[in-house]
């Protein structure tokens, strides 16, 4: 048994920004009290990981990225009660401690124990469980899934159905839940409403699915890559528009298409100009615009405050507004009951050592979700 021992395994280490991943042998320490060591089976490639490589999301280096995954518990530290060795689990980049003001509120989901920003990039006790070539390696978002084994705090891991296919449900660890929940939980899209979704990547398509599940009558997909339109329509978009096809600003195009603007708009890209456009494209008085894409570090947004004065609501959504430890097992159960699909989001499945190819597919717009298998 490996319990209580250091495990040597393969991991994708990012030694510095704007460089490819390096597959290295790392040492993964055993879990301390209230920690869980997990063998990762499948992990998705998400734009947020690429944001660290590009410098949009500022993190310390060297680091093991990855936050959308599924695996099996290898061993647990002292005092862990919610999971046991052999359990199938999904790591949670938004933990749920159950004790902080946010966890105790019925409204929020961004547990105070999160390590998204500003990030320590370490375990909650301020230390790392990874070493490589004698150097401590940083964690990412309390998850670090681009490795055969990782260590998570018990508050950052959810036990799921033992029959769940891990190479599919790993998307519930980030991309799918983030988009689907932005529509259902954050915006609370109503039946018969009109929606616009800016950005039709994996998360944007999940927003489309959430709008459809909520009963929206019109769902307009907005993307500069028209190759994304067929899949968007397959998943529920009623119209798709490419801003490049128009000389006028996209919010004016959407206003003309809908009369007074959409009831709900979603920015799922992470660009300040599209955030402002999404706000301007929703109904002047009761429109709701939701920021889902990760905003770039150190950028400011300028917009006409009259857009809000007239009554619009502007809000953000992290992990789809779901309280993670409570909701992830339920979302997996819903998937098992075929209440939604994940297959159309997974365009590529690659062996783990091809991680750099997977990121190239993301950057060139050739993939929606690539899943890496160990």
Curated annotation (Swiss-Prot):
Binds 2 Zn(2+) ions per subunit. InterPro entries: ADH-like_C, ADH-like_N, ADH_Zn_CS, GroES-like_sf, NAD(P)-bd_dom_sf, PKS_ER. Keywords: Acetylation, Cytoplasm, Metal-binding, NAD, Oxidoreductase, Zinc. Its cofactor is Zn(2+). NAD(+) binds at residues 199-204, 223, 228, 292-294, 369. Its main location: cytoplasm. Its EC number is 1.1.1.1. Zn(2+) 2 binds at residues 97, 100, 103, 111. Belongs to the zinc-containing alcohol dehydrogenase family. Class-I subfamily. This is Alcohol dehydrogenase 1. It comes from Struthio camelus (Common ostrich).
